[in-house]
Curated annotation (Swiss-Prot):
Xref: InterPro entries: JHDM1_Histone_Demethylase, JmjC_dom
Cofactors: Fe(2+)
Domain JmjC stretches: 141-328
Source organism (scientific name): Candida glabrata (strain ATCC 2001 / BCRC 20586 / JCM 3761 / NBRC 0622 / NRRL Y-65 / CBS 138)
Chemical reaction(s) catalysed: N(6),N(6)-dimethyl-L-lysyl(36)-[histone H3] + 2 2-oxoglutarate + 2 O2 = L-lysyl(36)-[histone H3] + 2 formaldehyde + 2 succinate + 2 CO2
GO MF assignments: histone H3K36me/H3K36me2 demethylase activity; metal ion binding; methylated histone binding
Keywords: Chromatin regulator, Dioxygenase, Iron, Metal-binding, Nucleus, Oxidoreductase, Transcription, Transcription regulation
Lineage of origin: Eukaryota, Fungi, Dikarya, Ascomycota, Saccharomycotina
Role played: Histone demethylase that specifically demethylates 'Lys-36' of histone H3, thereby playing a central role in histone code.
Protein name (database record): JmjC domain-containing histone demethylation protein 1
Domain of life: Eukaryota
Domain notes: The JmjC domain mediates the demethylation activity.
Family: Belongs to the JHDM1 histone demethylase family.
Binding site for substrate: T221, K241
Length: 403
């Protein structure tokens, strides 16, 4: 997910590019002082419209944070799967070909795909949110318009723009398989597939699982948290990306909230206030995994095509609930929050009760159950149970079984 840009998937965005939004309308998700960096730079170097003013500070911070990268921030897919429940740091998968991640269309697979291929698969007239990197605002373009822009030589582009919210799980002409570990750990899939008596055919699940991102050289996405503290998988088809990621320590989260609610947020470089940053550079073919709650900023040194998505996990329920609270404190509007989040948490409660009654052995921390009950007890949390008379009965049963 910041006043000027959209939220999620390692880079801020809205949930669905084809939501009904008036064409060419600029919009943000918090009301703040609007600052157009290109306008501020007008009259200076004409090239300034092609560089976000924070890039120099980003590069300095990136070099500093390289020293915090450790050997275990690169591991095989097999090792990652074995250690998944204990991993709380970002890392690269050293053998992405063994992950199960694959995207293909027109007899081409991930590394050979182009923006033209994506446009053909999704449709020329499909609308996408296009972010102006300087103003950090969005406009609605057709995919054909975007494709034409992307393919122009750099000197012919009028501004630096970014597409980071094209959800493609519905696209029939695009075979898109997530990493196997993501399919196994996705909490939405777990509860939708296993809670008894759910009408899953008439009850669509949240669509935040499969995205296509397209960034031109010098695109920049300012500091943000992915919505609801979701974890992220991020597969670079071609190009280059630079990330700086900071752990969700109490101090970092406090500074993030202060920055997010500042009237002049756009002019402040948050990296100067955060600690423990890790710098990661991604190249074509890399598969990157971001855990729950990491604050991060992204720079694009080369034109890039990325496939990735967000997912909730049972492992991170407590952290995810903390980030949901941060979203409330910083005034994130519903459009930029995880869809049906309360429904997912409610179904998680039912799933836990169901498993315990059936004698299924699960390692469940009391902290997780307490945090879940506390969140669900709130009168602001709306959920109608499927297998209980009401929410109160469900939570009492959950407490009796686990606490």
């Amino acid at each position: 997910m910041a006043v000027k840009i959209e939220q999620a998937l390692g880079e801020k965005r809205s949930l669905n590019d084809n939501d009904e939004v008036p064409r060419k309308k600029r919009y943000n998700f918090r009301k703040k002082v609007e600052l157009d960096y290109s306008a501020l730079n007008e009259g200076e170097d004409k090239k300034s419209k092609f560089f976000h003013p924070h890039i120099a500070l980003f590069e300095k911070e990136f070099e500093k944070c390289l020293s915090n990268v450790t050997e275990d921030m690169s591991m095989t897919c097999s090792e990652y799967c074995k250690r998944f429940d204990d991993i709380d740091f970002p890392l690269k998968i050293s053998d992405p070909e063994n992950s199960g991640m694959v995207v293909s269309t027109n007899n081409k697979t991930t590394r050979d795909l182009t923006v033209d291929d994506i446009t053909q698969a999704v449709g020329d007239d499909y609308f996408v949110n296009v972010m102006d990197v300087q103003s950090q605002e969005n406009e609605r373009w057709s995919l054909r318009e975007w494709c034409n822009y992307f393919n122009k030589p750099a000197e012919e582009k009028d501004r630096i723009r970014n597409v980071i919210s094209l959800e493609v799980s519905h696209v029939e002409d695009l075979q898109y398989d997530r990493p196997d570990i993501v399919d196994d750990k996705d909490l939405v899939d777990i509860v939708w597939n296993n809670v008894e008596n759910l009408d899953t055919e008439n009850d669509p699940r949240p669509k935040v699982t499969k995205y296509c991102l397209m960034s031109v050289k010098n695109a920049f996405t300012d500091y943000h948290l992915d919505f609801a503290g979701t974890s992220v998988y991020y597969n670079l088809a071609f190009g280059k990306k630079k990330f700086i990621l900071y752990p969700p320590t109490p101090e970092n989260i406090e500074n993030y909230i202060e920055w997010s609610t500042s009237t002049y947020q756009n002019m402040l470089f948050l990296g100067e206030k955060l600690t423990g940053g890790v710098a990661m550079e991604l190249n074509g073919g890399d598969l990157f995994m971001i855990p729950s709650g990491y604050i991060h900023v992204v720079y694009t040194p080369e034109d890039s095509l990325i496939f990735g998505g967000n997912y909730l996990t049972f492992r991170d329920i407590s952290q995810q609930l903390k980030i949901v609270d941060v979203e409330k404190q910083t005034g994130v509007t519903k459009r930029y929050t995880f869809p049906m989040f309360d429904e997912v948490m409610g179904r998680t409660c039912e799933w836990l009760c169901q498993n315990q009654k059936k004698g299924k052995q699960m390692q469940v921390k009391k902290e997780t159950v307490n945090d879940l009950i506390s969140y669900m007890k709130s009168g602001k949390t709306k959920y109608k149970p499927t297998n209980f008379i009401n929410k109160k009965q469900m939570l009492q049963e959950l407490s009796n079984l686990y606490l």
